[in-house]
């Protein structure tokens, strides 16, 4: 099983390592796309140690114009974690202006968004409309949850507990594996 993670620029990025380590221990191969803003917040050397696949960014697409297509074809599942209001809005509105958003637009695989943002951003009417649009299209959301946010405030917007995230991903992987190599009429 191969999963493509799209990492966007949220402070919750620090929890991705736990998720990757657990999934890697279950022999799940992970590739990552790191957005421009995420690159400012994450240690790429540490990230590389927690995944078995490759790390991609906008720079890589300059050498391979089909990279967004190739990534969706070789992975079984696409997960955006942490998902910011920016990447949610881009996908909801069909904006494809970087590797992360063009890959989402090119994907025909199951897509999960795992949001993390301040409550004010999560509850914003435009953000909620975008989330609703995506859910109506069959995009799945894991979280967010209510609790203490990175900024110190308490509210809805915190990244879901990493154990819950990994359990839900494993459940989806198991569902996908049931139908692997099967032909349905």
Regions found by a protein language model. Give the residues of each.
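N-terminal nucleotide-binding beta1-loop-alpha1 segment
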Residues: 184-185
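A cross-family phosphate/adenosyl-ligand binding-site feature
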Residues: 1-112, 118-181
């Amino acid at each position: 099983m191969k999963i493509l993670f799209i990492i966007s620029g949220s402070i919750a990025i620090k929890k991705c390592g736990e998720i990757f380590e657990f999934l890697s221990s279950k022999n799940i191969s992970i590739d990552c796309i790191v957005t421009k803003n995420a690159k400012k917040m994450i240690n790429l050397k540490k990230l590389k140690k927690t995944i078995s696949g490759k790390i991609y960014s906008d720079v890589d697409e300059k050498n391979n114009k089909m990279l967004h297509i190739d990534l969706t074809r070789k992975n079984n599942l696409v997960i955006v974690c942490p998902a910011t209001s920016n990447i949610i809005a881009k996908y909801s509105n069909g904006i494809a202006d970087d590797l992360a958003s063009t890959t989402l637009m090119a994907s025909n695989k199951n897509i999960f968004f795992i949001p993390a943002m301040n409550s004010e951003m999560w509850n914003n009417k435009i953000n909620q409309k975008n989330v609703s649009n995506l859910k109506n299209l069959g995009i799945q959301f894991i979280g967010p949850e209510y609790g203490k946010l990175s900024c110190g405030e308490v509210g809805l917007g915190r990244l879901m507990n990493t154990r819950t995230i990994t359990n839900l991903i494993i459940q989806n992987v198991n569902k996908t594996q049931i139908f692997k190599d099967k032909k349905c009429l």
